[in-house]
């Protein structure tokens, strides 16, 4: 079995449990206005919220504060909070309750978080607990960490609803709580760190595909899994763009994290329509498989979307694809540790730390392609200049 095939098989097993950042930055809310992300008569996604959509559309146009060379330190429209009551003299013990490492995005993230902690001499100890993508285990982990003398608690929740009460109990101990990646429905954490969100991701990629395919162009929407809120939000935003630009979405199909199925879907649509003018994907898992399906049909690869996975970036460069890669940046794992150091030093932090959401284009592709890294290494880690790179991230 090839290295990529083995990796893909592993991912297919776990993606149903833990998508890379598998919830959006805010807990899902349902819009009741009757407006929706689609043509008249198309049912509205239960995850769609007009206000959240409008906010993210605006945020992606706002220049973040801070140095663009360190995007993990940048922030969009921050409201700073005082942290002086959390000042801790001497060496620190940080604790991290992780939802799990069930996919390569999270593996890259955890490696990056640990490397960031090593950069701060004030951090004497870092305790990491893996919930194995199980709510019950993470709830128990959080209770156990409250007995470990943690000076700050970082949490990447497994799910929103189940973990909210456990995080509220952690906040009540007086230890500062930092939540990142996935949100909870309480504002008790000192800060909540996340990129802009799924609507921005979907709109960025759909605008590119609509521009390249043109009005009336035939576009196949390749979905990963149903009923995952961030993926639903990505598709909802894309549907808005496609409807507005007059794109003909000839099909919306789920590959269910199955690469052969993704190839079969493409082959079937090529037989039906003869030519596809673009493929929009709500996640980059199947982007390489989609390109390979066009190769098998002896057709040029049309404009398509991907993410910052090395296999896709390498194919993009090699074949000079017409592509774009919106991202869910891994560098937020760095921000979580940095926020903890700020809080324990008494430095203000944003109540909601919104990070910029990198878009990889042909012009910036070479900045993110890292030769020699594993196929599913995610290059938005901001880790390329950290001590131990590339060895610590290569899995060797």
Model-derived segments and spans:
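Bacterial lipoprotein signal-peptidase II cleavage site
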Residues: 21-31
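Hinge/cleft segment of the Venus flytrap/periplasmic-binding protein
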Residues: 31-92, 333-396
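Extracytoplasmic "Venus flytrap"
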Residues: 34-87, 92-112, 116, 120, ...
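Hydrophobic alpha-helical
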Residues: 155-170, 238, 250, 255-315
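An alpha-beta-alpha
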Residues: 94-95, 113-115, 203-253, 340-343, ...
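Hydrophobic alpha-helical segments within soluble ligand-binding/sensing domains
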Residues: 80-81, 138, 193-219, 233, ...
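Flexible loop/hinge segments that line or gate small-molecule binding clefts
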Residues: 52, 161-200, 218, 309-317, ...
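Structural motif
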Residues: 78-81, 126-149, 252-272, 287-289
């Amino acid at each position: 079995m090839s290295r990529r095939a083995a990796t893909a098989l592993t991912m297919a097993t776990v993606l149903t449990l833990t998508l890379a950042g598998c919830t959006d930055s805010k807990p899902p809310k349902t819009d009741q206005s009757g407006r929706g992300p689609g043509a008249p008569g198309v049912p509205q996604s239960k995850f769609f919220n007009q206000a959240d959509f409008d906010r993210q559309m605006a945020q992606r146009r706002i220049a973040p504060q801070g140095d663009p060379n360190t995007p993990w330190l940048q922030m969009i429209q921050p409201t700073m909070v005082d942290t002086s009551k959390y000042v801790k003299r001497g060496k620190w013990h940080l604790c991290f309750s992780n939802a799990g490492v069930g996919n390569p995005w999270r593996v890259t993230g955890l490696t990056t978080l640990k490397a960031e902690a090593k950069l701060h001499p004030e951090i004497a100890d870092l305790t990491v607990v893996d919930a194995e993508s199980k709510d019950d285990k993470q709830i128990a982990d959080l209770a156990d960490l409250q007995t470990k003398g943690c000076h700050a608690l970082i949490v990447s929740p497994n799910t929103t609803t189940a973990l909210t009460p456990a995080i509220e109990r952690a906040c009540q101990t007086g230890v500062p709580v930092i939540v990142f990646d996935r949100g909870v429905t309480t504002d008790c954490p000192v800060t909540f760190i996340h990129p802009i969100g799924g609507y921005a991701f979907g709109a960025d990629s759909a605008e590119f595909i609509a521009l390249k395919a043109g009005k009336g162009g035939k576009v196949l929407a390749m979905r990963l899994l149903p009923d995952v809120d961030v993926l639903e939000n990505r598709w909802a935003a894309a549907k808005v763009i496609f409807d507005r630009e007059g794109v003909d979405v000839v099909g919306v199909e789920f590959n269910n994290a199955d690469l052969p199925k993704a190839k079969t879907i493409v082959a079937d649509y090529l037989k039906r329509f003869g030519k596809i003018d673009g493929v929009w994907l709500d996640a980059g898992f199947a982007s390489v498989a989609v390109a390979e399906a066009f190769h098998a049909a002896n057709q040029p690869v049309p404009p398509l979307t991907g993410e910052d996975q090395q296999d896709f970036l390498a194919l993009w460069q090699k074949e000079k694809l017409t592509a774009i890669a919106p991202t869910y940046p891994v560098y937020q794992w760095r921000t979580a540790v940095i926020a903890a150091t700020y809080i324990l030093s008494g430095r203000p932090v944003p109540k909601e730390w919104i990070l910029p959401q990198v878009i990889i284009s042909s012009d910036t592709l070479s900045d993110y392609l890292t030769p020699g890294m594993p196929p599913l290494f995610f290059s938005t880690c901001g880790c390329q200049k950290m001590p131990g790179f590339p060895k610590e991230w290569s899995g060797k």
